[in-house]
Amino acid sequence: METAKPRILVVEDEAAIRDGLTDLLVYHGFEVDAVGDGRDGLQKALSGQHDLLLLDVMLPGRDGFAICDEVRKVDRDVAIIMLTAKTSDDDIVNGLALGADDYIAKPFSIAQLVLRVKAVLRRSRALAAAAAQIKLAGDVEIDVQNLSGRRGKESLTFTRREMEILEYLQRNTQRPVSRDELLTRVWGYDRSAEIETRTVDIHVAKLRRKIEVDAKEPRSLITVRGAGYRLLVSA
């Protein structure tokens, strides 16, 4: 039986970039829908028909941040990569805080774009085969498959990227995991690429606010000085 091709939505207002991305992704075996307007992009993004969204930040109608925000209110599973000429810390934090899995700064390497798209989709499949639950200190239980959990009586929800981080740390709970390892194994970045590690720190900070009783004094997702992060699970 032939496996269905992953379906990607490209929302990019510059026609040359949009057409180039479409041709590139089709060449690499993906099905692609492409639009150049933020309002049309939001409508298609909310259809639930795509495995991954490539969103430009600066768009007519609705910008990429707004699309990401609206999608994450109803869909925590679809992968989202932001395409942006904005690379300041505030812009990066904003996109990731709204639930984007990754961001790629323009101008970008074609090879790196394809690698990141494939890595995001590959991790999605790996997550589906992960352990069912993770238990942490503070009466925290995490349901990996449903991207949800609870801390005491409080319900928790996670983005797919957040759960991928937790799942990878849980599989390697006996040791600290470095930022570089997370970027390579979870994000799928090339080891030779110069990557801003603040991406990892932003996601870890978000996770701590969800799973820790006191995010400033973490008991479960701890920092090992000079080595990285470690997840301490409960029996």
Description of each model-found segment:
Residues 1-126:
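N-terminal/domain-start alpha-helical segments
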Residues 189-198:
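Short, positively charged loop/turn segments that connect secondary-structure elements
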Residues 1-3, 74, 134, 150, ...:
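Short, flexible hinge/linker loops that cap or flank conserved catalytic cores
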Residues 127-134, 157, 202-235:
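DNA-binding patch around the recognition helix
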Residues 72, 121, 170, 190, ...:
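Protein kinase-like catalytic domain
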Residues 165-166, 182, 200, 207, ...:
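DNA major-groove recognition helices of helix-turn-helix
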Residues 4-7, 119-176, 180:
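Short, Lys/Arg-enriched segments at the junction into DNA-binding effector domains
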Residues 111, 175-186:
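Short coil-to-helix segment of the ABC ATPase nucleotide-binding domain corresponding to the Q-loop/switch region
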